[in-house]
């Protein structure tokens, strides 16, 4: 994901730099979402792109921020969804069906691993109920093809390349969340928003699949003024077409979804813009 975030940041700079009078943009490559929160806390960065769940953990002092909350990175906009997708052998239709199965839950300590256990836990499954193995999603796909595991989790924008490739030569089965599973997940983890993958997102997918997603989220330091952030957010939405030409992910940018996913404090500059256009 760091590759996509860096590319998205680069397009923001290219398109918006000339439009901004109150700030200039510089893009830095970093060590992913947790590092990005730390950089804002330390004053090394003023804005960052990161996963919406990570900003939640930072504000709550959970997971990677256990007992040490960091609250000065504020919500600006959810840019696009990163969907929690569960690729499984045929016959596994709900999360509950994963009981007793061997599942690749992502790399150790990854965001995917955290999201996988959130989804499994909300369905009532503990670490004793499944045989969890760690590895990248590509590892999981390969092991699924070889019959070594029963399912694999990934958290990525759909359509995801590894699933597209898998679907060309294998029977595609993506696990769809039941209404009860979805309700339990959203009650426990409000930052996991509903995301339905429309039929035809992948070859061989003939029905909609109900998933949850986190968002690739733009945050800003609370030390940035309201005026600076307001100007930035307005310029971003005003120049959506040019941004989308630069990177397809900006096609998903929408004021409703950009503001709706906010489960932490919103930056006053962003809030001013959303209220002005009537989505808040």
Model-based region annotation:
Residues 1-19, 23-27, 81-146, 260, ...:
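Bilobed "Venus flytrap"/periplasmic-binding protein-like clamshell domains
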Residues 26, 46-51, 75, 85-87, ...:
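Structural recognition of the beta-strand scaffold that forms the well-ordered cores
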Residues 209-280:
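Segments of small-molecule ligand-sensing domains
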Residues 13-21, 41-45, 60, 91, ...:
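Sec-exported extracytoplasmic/periplasmic mature domains
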């Amino acid at each position: 994901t760091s590759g996509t975030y860096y590319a998205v940041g680069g397009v923001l700079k290219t398109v918006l730099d000339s439009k901004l009078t109150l700030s200039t943009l510089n893009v830095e490559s970093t060590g992913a979402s947790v590092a990005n929160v730390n950089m804002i806390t330390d004053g090394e960065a003023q804005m960052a792109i990161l996963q919406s769940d990570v900003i939640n953990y930072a504000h709550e002092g959970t997971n990677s921020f256990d007992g040490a909350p960091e609250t000065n990175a504020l919500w600006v906009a959810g840019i696009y969804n990163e969907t929690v997708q569960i690729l499984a052998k045929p016959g596994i239709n709900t999360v509950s069906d994963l009981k007793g199965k061997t599942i690749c839950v992502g790399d150790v300590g990854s965001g995917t691993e955290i999201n996988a256990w959130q989804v499994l836990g909300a369905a009532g499954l503990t670490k004793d109920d499944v045989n969890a193995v760690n590895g990248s999603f590509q590892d999981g796909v390969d092991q699924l093809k070889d019959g070594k595991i029963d399912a694999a989790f990934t958290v990525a924008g759909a359509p995801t390349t590894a699933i597209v490739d898998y679907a060309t030569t294998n029977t595609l089965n993506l696990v769809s969340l039941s209404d009860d599973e979805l309700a339990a997940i959203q009650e426990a983890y409000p930052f996991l928003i509903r995301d339905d993958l429309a039929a035809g997102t992948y070859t061989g997918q003939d029905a909609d699949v109900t998933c949850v997603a986190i968002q690739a989220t733009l945050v800003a330091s609370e030390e940035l003024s309201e005026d600076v952030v307001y100007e930035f957010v307005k310029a971003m939405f005003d120049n959506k077409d040019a941004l989308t030409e630069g990177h397809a992910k900006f096609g998903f940018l929408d004021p409703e979804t950009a503001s709706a996913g906010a489960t932490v404090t919103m930056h006053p500059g962003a809030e001013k813009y959303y209220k002005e256009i009537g989505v808040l």
